[in-house]
From Swiss-Prot:
Protein name according to UniProt: Very-long-chain 3-oxoacyl-CoA reductase
Pathway where this protein functions: Lipid metabolism; fatty acid biosynthesis
Record field: transmembrane: 19-39
Subcellular location per the Swiss-Prot or TrEMBL entry: Endoplasmic reticulum membrane
Xref: Gene3D superfamilies: NAD(P)-binding Rossmann-like Domain
Amino acid sequence: MSVVDFIQAITENKFGEYVLLGALLVGVFKLTVFILSVTSLLVDLFVLPATNLKTYGAKKGKWAVITGASDGIGKEYAFQLASKGFNVVLVSRTQAKLETLASEIEAKYKVETKVVAFDASTDAEDNYKSLGDAISGLPVTVLINNVGQSHSIPVPFLETENKELQDIITINVTATLKITQTVAPVIAETVSKEKKKVRGLILTMGSFGGLLPTPYLATYSGSKSFLQAWSAALAGELQSQGVDVELVISYLVTSAMSKIRRASLSIPSPKNFVRATLNGIGRRNGAQERYATSTPYWAHALMHFGIDQTVGVYSKLANSLNLNMHKSIRARALKKAARLAAEKKD
């Protein structure tokens, strides 16, 4: 039976005609949604102008709190927010690095700074008290939850050292939540006092490791996936208080954590990644199907959108590809470690 004969047979039956019409309407609907998603993606990435950070108090004497501020992406957030006219509270582990960075920012951008030495791996209440004391009375409108840790190399979950496991959970999850509980009330109070003439902003750094379940990075992957759900839930809670909450998803960025030194089209420098993030606040970019989430860097956005529209983030195929990739990375890392150990003996 040809396709024409099949369709003719269906249309001769009223029920079959309705089924065919229903299938056609579903197809048209899905195609329309896809076209709208692609259009929104391209407009977000390449058409809309940069977000005006005056919405969040830039050049109005307001403060931004940045965690993990002494290196990499966190340091770049500090530079770029200061360049936009925010005073900055720099939060990181090493006091000396923080003081050097604060002096550089004050000299270059003529803004005020404060530093808070904070070891996020310890979960010590003194840390949160020190942070709370530092921001008490300040008109804080922005929090950048940047502090984070991954595995030293890809590792099977059953072979993960207890300290590494505990540090990842404490830094990525516990510290992020407690820091937000410390800072968010100050942001909400500032917005309220300003009668919502400015808005508050909480950006939390996510990862493709949280977007896609990632074998051999199971603990890190789980911690970032947790942040994804938590951040979206928090966005719903704080919206009525004039505070925008957004999870920022990235693939690889040149940094100490990724161990990648050279930038490329798909792997931006911290400077380019942070610029894309700040320019695109409030837009989903590659995260077209996710609430209060953005994948801002254009190459990462296209990758995210492509995965969502094809294999899906939770598919067996995506999991298998991730497994094989990280097995290979682990094998190379172990081989390199063995070579360096042998050279050291010689």
